[in-house]
A protein has these predicted regions:
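Membrane-embedded segments
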Residues: 66-83, 87-94, 100-109
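A substrate-binding/cap region within the structured catalytic cores of diverse enzymes
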Residues: 91-92, 103-223, 227
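Solvent-exposed loop/turn segments at secondary-structure junctions
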Residues: 63-67, 98-102, 153-157, 242-245
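Zymogen propeptides
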Residues: 40-41, 45-81
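Structural recognition of the beta-strand scaffold that forms the well-ordered cores
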Residues: 58-59, 92-96, 146-150, 237-238
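N- or domain-start disorder-to-order transition segments that initiate the globular core
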Residues: 16-55
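C-terminal accessory segments enriched in acidic
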Residues: 6, 19, 189-261
């Protein structure tokens, strides 16, 4: 049976230093504080891990390039790994920072078949990889954790926005598989919220924009499906920097049909 956190239980709110819980202003950009509830009650890292220890999936949002956020991610991953060892559960790291097209390169690095320079070059690592995401990958490599490259390839997403979802039918199978098999384009609350935010453009153009956004979001749900089918029941996944538009992907992923164990 799949266990899910309440919607948006994570990302946790960031503000100041985490251990012990306190509400003092941050002293440096490397200080963070976790908070919970509408009143943002201080929460220690150990308390946060205890809150999510039974979850199948932990979502961690981020402010790109903010040192405290990336420090939190590294600390959280280490704590979750220790918790998973104690509980006998597996742990998988899913990352926005690599696209699905780069999964073979990432796998080769984790297996020791290529070096870090090749990973950065051929895996199209972001410019801030050495400072912000390397600790996650190196920890996963040392602990022999599975790492999922979860992002959609940007060129494919751009073409969907320009040509529409029908363009995907023209792709060879090897490229088409890098996006979700089907895009969720129905008139659900996510689409309504997205369309309401657009204040220009015609209906067809906006529909293509929504298809592009959905093609960006859907591979995250696909990554969860891969994880669910490839690791033992009871394992959990932590996913930093979720690629969502104002929480819409999280809403969709929380639906019962989104994840099967």
């Amino acid at each position: 049976m799949t266990r899910r956190l309440p919607l948006l239980a994570l990302p946790l709110l960031l503000a100041a230093c985490a251990t012990p819980p306190q509400s003092q202003p941050p002293q440096t950009l490397y200080h963070y504080q976790l908070g919970e509830g509408t009143d943002d009650r201080p929460l220690s890292l150990a308390q946060a891990v205890d809150r999510v220890k039974d979850a199948d999936i932990v979502l961690v949002g981020e402010l790109h390039s903010h040192p405290a956020v990336h420090l939190l991610q590294a600390n959280l991953l280490a704590e979750l790994a220790e918790q998973s060892r104690q509980d006998g559960r597996g742990l998988v790291l899913s990352m926005e920072q690599f696209s699905r097209a780069d999964q073979p390169v990432l796998d080769a690095y984790l297996a020791g078949r290529i070096g870090e320079a090749a990973l950065i070059r051929d895996g199209h690592a972001w410019p801030n990889y050495p400072s912000d995401y390397r600790p996650l990958v190196e920890f996963a490599k040392a602990q022999q954790l599975t790492v999922i490259a979860a992002n959609a390839p940007k060129p494919l997403v751009s073409c969907v926005g320009q040509e529409g979802p029908e363009w995907l039918d023209k792709l060879p199978a090897s490229r088409r598989s890098q996006l979700a098999r089907e895009l969720t384009l129905g008139d659900d609350p996510y689409r309504q919220k997205f369309m309401a935010s657009l204040h220009h453009g015609d209906a067809d153009g906006n529909a293509r924009r929504f298809a592009a956004q959905t093609s960006w979001d859907e591979p995250w749900r696909r990554a969860w499906s891969i994880i669910s089918s490839s690791i033992p029941a009871g394992a959990s996944c932590t996913s930093p920097a979720t690629s969502t538009w104002r929480g819409g992907w999280v809403s969709r992923a929380a639906s019962p049909a989104a994840i099967r164990r």
